Amino acid sequence: MMQQFKFKKNILSGILTSNILASCLLCVISGIAFAEDLILPGVEVRAARLYESSPSFRETSDTASLLSDEPGISLYRAGGVSSLPVIHGLADDRIRIKVDGMDLISSCANHMTPPLSYIDPSNVNNIKVFAGITPVSVGGDSIAGTILVNSAAPEFSQAGQDLLINAQMGTFYRSNNDARGINLSTSVANDKAYMRYTGSTVEANNYKAGGKFKPSGLAAVNASTDRTKDRGHLAGDEVGSSYYKSRNQALAFGVNLDNHLLELKLGWQDIPSQGFVNQRMDMTDNDSQQYNLSYAGQYGWGNLAARAYHERTRHSMQFGDDKLFWYGATGMVAGMPMDTEGKTSGVNVQGDINLSQRDVLRVGTEYQRYRLDDYWRASPPAPAMSPNTFWNVNNGQRDRYDVFAEWEAKWNTQWLSLLGLRSSTVKMNAGNVQGYNVLMYGAAATVFNKSDRSKTDNNVDSTALVRFTPDASQTYEAGYAMKTRSPNVYERFAWANSNTMVMNMNNLYGDGNGYVGNLKLKAETAHTLSATANWRDAVQQDWQLTATPYITYVDDYIDAVACAKVGKVCAARTDGFVNLSLDNQTARLYGVDVSGQMSLFRGGGFGSLSAIGALNYVRGKNLDTGDDLYNIMPLNAKFALEHRLGGWTNTIQTKLVDSKNNVQAMRKELKTAGYGLVNIYSSYEWKYARLDLGVENVFDKFYADPLGGAYLGQGATMGTGVLHGVTVPGIGRSVNVGLTLKY
């Protein structure tokens, strides 16, 4: 199923974590309940909405949070701008994410730079989500689905009219973590050309949980007698390493010639600091540049679209303000500097050919070129970290060549179908590596360097969808998809099992464990069956109910295993965490998403009142071991009441999450208790301004985030100095305010 969310152009990029209309719940549930797009691309039926979503729903720092309340989607919490979306229990590289058509890759051994982190929420105009049954035309090399994020489309003036000038500015403040930010957008256009600038900056301190979850005291104490090298004080409810600072800028230029549009988009990102509460390292710098040239044209035979893009990331990690920096008995080892350089380039061409009034044929080709260098400079005088530079990945290569064809048929007013096939070839390789020194790392490096590192996967995707609309009050959809994903660079090429310290640094999961890759990994293949039923009143204004059950079998699912299972010897640990590798297994996931809305009353002097709700359930199992899959969101539900009167919008929202008892034993995943949260939002909108107010977690409830991972926000995180057993808590009460001005 595909949902699309459009955001009104109020630049305030959202000030409140979910904000007004029941936060993203209302915005996102409306993607199904109120503004449903068909599964079939290019066929769109939009029902009447009870409200129009706006950027005030958005959490300014984290674009992924725009999806946090969408049925079937949850989030792996990471840094303040770097959450990872999860679709039906599958996350990270198992989801294809495109930002303005660019197919981006995270260049980090901890995946601190996911694709959604490269666009600020204030620059997002709409998001499309394809869950499970994904048309081959919207992406391959993924098994969970596709997320398409787009900035605003160009606006041109009418011929003969004056220049069209728009400007917007917003600011916000969140009390819990002292988060503050500002964003700006301005554009100018005539009937042939346009130019737009967007910029934003956000900064926040550590957030506070709804209660104490650890002792108060110094964040980290070094082994020497020099107390000036200790880390500062953290309160018992302060979540260490949850601070962040981010700056984003973008320029867009476009030329419109009759039925042809040529656009150039440039993006810059600067993150000088971002703590990671569930990783042993923190981001100390992230510089990214994006170049994106696209063409779209309409012809007598159909549409043609083409794109060429390039993205470069320079990423640095070190121990941040809340983690021990000075190591060694005399406190002379200055942390563990880590650097990454990633380059992603791509070319896409797609043609939509109108074969007849009934039939559309989509054909296309894609090429993606990815290069990665991941190296750790020596940190003397530590014997284990000198004298050489440690090469974690040297000239990592991942090239993908795809072609696809897709046939969409509108048989009559009731029946639609879609059939698609995609062929994908993924070629990977990496250069020779070395450790800090030969004595401690030479053996593992030699084994890797003598291995055949050139890998080629020939993958096939297929999709079959059908939609039946017997009348205006009901729609039924069903489909099957076979999707494949090749391993990423770190899953295949992370080589070092020499000691716990270096294994700790390769962790894509936030569980605190150490990992080493596996050159023998195969591509994952997922088989998904899904159906959707949607019932509503005939005029699609009073009520809607949508239910989507699904089941997915994954052959060669990449999961954590004991090192010995894949012939590797890894150090034992005494801190409660484990050192692991990866291997292909068989997995099964199944669940159901339910969402709905009802207009309780409308019109008159009391305005309108609506009720909105959603329920999500997913279960994941490793069929080879009988173990549960990692980081599966427990049963959860959201309910909201929204009142509108004139310019006022007022919402009260409740979120309920069941306890997480189905956890993965292999990773020593921690259980979490169930909880309920209450949020209140209010806004007033004038013609050129909007004021937003909100209180989130009204009762300051303490809870553990089910997908938050292990708490590693403070202490000596390099090795075994932090003990296993503490989960990352959710944020406590926060009072939020924001103001938007537009011209």
Language model regions located:
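Flexible loop and strand-edge segments within Gram-negative outer membrane beta-barrel domains
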Residues: 242-246, 259-304, 312-344, 378, ...
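Transmembrane beta-barrel wall of Gram-negative outer-membrane proteins
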Residues: 175-204, 214-272, 287-301, 354-361, ...
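C-terminal beta-signal and adjacent terminal beta-strands/loops
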Residues: 210, 484-485, 560, 611, ...
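Outer-membrane beta-barrel signature, preferentially recognizing the C-terminal barrel domain
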Residues: 281-299, 339-344, 392-400, 448-469, ...
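Gram-negative outer-membrane beta-barrel transporters
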Residues: 357, 410-417, 426, 542-562, ...
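Surface-exposed extracellular loop regions of Gram-negative outer-membrane beta-barrel proteins
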Residues: 270-272, 312-316, 371-373, 378, ...
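Acidic, small-polar-rich N-terminal luminal/periplasmic segments of exported/outer-membrane proteins
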Residues: 36-160
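Outer-membrane beta-barrel translocator/receptor signature
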Residues: 122-125, 131, 136-222, 244-247
